[in-house]
Design a protein with these regions (language model features):
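C-terminal transmembrane helix pair
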Residues: 156-157, 217, 345-364, 377-488
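Interfacial loop-to-helix junctions that mark the boundaries of transmembrane helices
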Residues: 2-3, 24-31, 43-44, 71-80, ...
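Flexible hinge motifs at transmembrane-helix junctions and intramembrane kinks/re-entrant loops
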Residues: 24-29, 39-56, 73, 137, ...
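Hydrophobic core segments of alpha-helical transmembrane domains in multi-pass membrane transport
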Residues: 8-22, 36-46, 59-64, 87-93, ...
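Membrane-embedded alpha-helical segments and adjacent helix-loop junctions characteristic
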Residues: 21, 39, 52-161, 327-331, ...
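Juxtamembrane and boundary regions of transmembrane helices in multi-pass small-molecule transporters
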Residues: 2-21, 97-100, 136, 158-177, ...
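Re-entrant/interfacial helical elements at transmembrane boundaries that shape
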Residues: 57-59, 138-152, 171, 184-201, ...
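Alpha-helical transmembrane segments
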Residues: 80-90, 132-143, 213-229, 301-312, ...
Length: 488
């Protein structure tokens, strides 16, 4: 509460001081834009008002301060990237409505035996695979009750110390796998789509789904393996096997009943959507090229992943289904629109409007002039610095809001360095998903901490190690992979 109060006072007083007494590049418009950026930064970091409310500030202040017209500012709040987000959420909600996500998770868990190490590996794979396509929060909320039931059964024949170690290993594996899984696809988590929009703005090209996955998938797999090794060494050694754990998973599967026709239909739509996303733009790695399906259509250049997402989401309102009580319905109905995360949609728009203001006011050009000293810094050191800074920032702030704030600054930095913005924007985006230390860092961390089974100091202890590993892996693999996958 105190943080919010301080944020509210500072978020108003400091921008007023900047407008009245500071001079950014000798331009009043630049100073006004800097004041708006500072206000939004403080409000987003302290959450003095809701994040979505802060995102609406440009619509009010930009026209009043002469930065941009209402019409031009409002246009930033809705674009194809936002529709990709909305379409992806609708498909994810269909999976949740018909319990397809739970069936997928339990089938993955059933493959692994009753040994704690194998079970944790199963939880990590199930969580990561689901969070690639549905929200990290929804995935964690679904996996947590299953994990708690297994913990309750397993701790009956363990010592208190063994039970606590197993609890830590299993619950932390869910939180961290949800975050890492989200980074591996373009729709897995909001910062990825923020990157996609900014990349489109600066390059006039869309980010291909396969292009993203060729970069993020190897990094994500490397991080998951590292997570598994670290958690196994810290918490899962010398724990006994148990056939009861497998029986519990099998029991959960039986409760779901038979694979319904509605689940099959949602699965077919989901697989078709994923295939269309991945193959739309084709695959280009060095001299290796495969044409995407859109290149064979008369107006294929007008289609993007947002078009695919909305088309497939709309299709589910037409496909008939039988409800759990035998009633006739469709895969989705009008209720889904009340379940969409509209605050995140507004948060996206606010970030894009902020970036638009940076360009329109000349603040981006001013920042580029001030960053001339970075020319002497080596590229790898710069990537490492950006990755580290982003990782630390997102430990205490919203990763989506932070990504929105940082992108315009990274664009200015890249301009000074005379390099492609991808070198800085991509590692920053990936590291935004790797805040492992504090409960407030990510929704999965907060949900797992909210179970009451983990102390803050226990999360910090393993989180510090994993943060360092994530920074090194993302920096190193970005430096190595970007030249092969992106035009730099």
């Amino acid at each position: 509460m105190m943080m919010k109060r301080v944020g509210l006072i500072t978020g108003i007083a400091l921008p007023l001081y900047i407008m009245l007494f500071s001079n950014f590049g000798g331009s009043e418009q630049t100073s006004r834009m800097a004041a708006c950026a500072v206000m939004m930064s403080i409000f987003w970091i302290t959450e003095a008002i809701p994040l979505a409310a802060t995102a609406l500030i440009p619509l009010t202040l930009f026209p009043i301060l002469g930065i941009a017209s209402s019409k031009a500012t409002a246009a930033q709040y809705m674009n194809s990237t936002v529709f990709l987000l909305i379409g992806g959420f609708i498909i994810a909600l269909a999976m949740q409505r018909w319990n397809l996500h739970k069936r997928i998770a339990l089938n993955i868990l059933a493959v692994f035996g009753g040994h704690p190490i194998q079970l944790v590996l199963g939880f990590m794979l199930a969580t990561a695979m689901l969070s690639m396509w549905i929200s990290n929060t929804a995935t964690t909320l679904m996996m947590l009750p299953i994990a708690l039931a297994i913990i309750a059964r397993y701790e009956q024949f363990l010592s208190e110390q063994q039970a606590h170690r197993f609890t830590l290993g299993l619950l932390l594996s869910i939180a961290y796998s949800a975050s890492v899984g989200g980074m591996m696809t373009l729709v897995g988590t909001a910062p990825n789509l923020v990157f996609a929009r900014f990349y489109q703005l600066v390059s006039d090209q869309s980010v291909g789904f396969a292009q993203w996955m060729m970069m993020a998938l190897p990094i994500g797999i490397c991080l998951l393996l590292t997570l598994f090794v670290v958690l196994s060494l810290l918490y899962l050694r010398n724990l006994p096997n148990s056939t009861e754990l497998r029986q519990l998973v099998d029991g959960e599967k039986k409760e779901l009943g038979k694979f319904s026709s509605a689940e099959k239909a949602v699965l077919l739509v989901f697989l078709t959507t994923a295939t269309l996303w991945i193959t739309r733009k084709g695959i280009n790695v060095g001299s290796f090229n495969i044409q995407g399906w859109s290149s064979y259509l008369p107006y294929g250049e007008m289609i993007d992943d947002g078009s695919v997402a909305v088309a497939m989401a709309t299709l589910m309102f037409f496909i008939p289904a039988t409800g759990r009580q035998g009633e006739k319905t469709t895969l989705l109905d009008k209720k889904v629109f009340s379940e969409l995360p509209w605050p995140i949609v507004l948060l996206f728009g606010g970030g894009f409007a902020l970036a638009f203001g940076f360009t329109e006011s000349g603040l981006s050009a001013y920042l580029a002039e001030q960053l001339q000293g970075l020319k002497s810094v080596s590229l790898y050191v710069l990537i490492l610095s950006v990755t580290t800074g982003m990782n630390l920032l997102t430990e205490l702030t919203s990763n989506t809001a932070t990504t929105q704030l940082v992108m315009p600054i990274l664009l200015s930095t890249a301009k000074v360095m005379e390099i492609s913005p991808v070198w800085l924007m991509l590692p920053a985006t990936l590291s935004a998903s790797c805040a492992f230390m504090f409960p407030v860092a990510t929704p999965p961390n907060a949900i797992i901490f909210g179970s009451g089974r983990i102390k803050v100091v226990e999360m910090v202890k393993v989180g510090v190690v994993l943060n360092i590993i994530a920074i090194l892996v993302i920096s190193g693999m970005s430096y190595w992979l970007i030249p092969y996958i992106w035009v730099t």
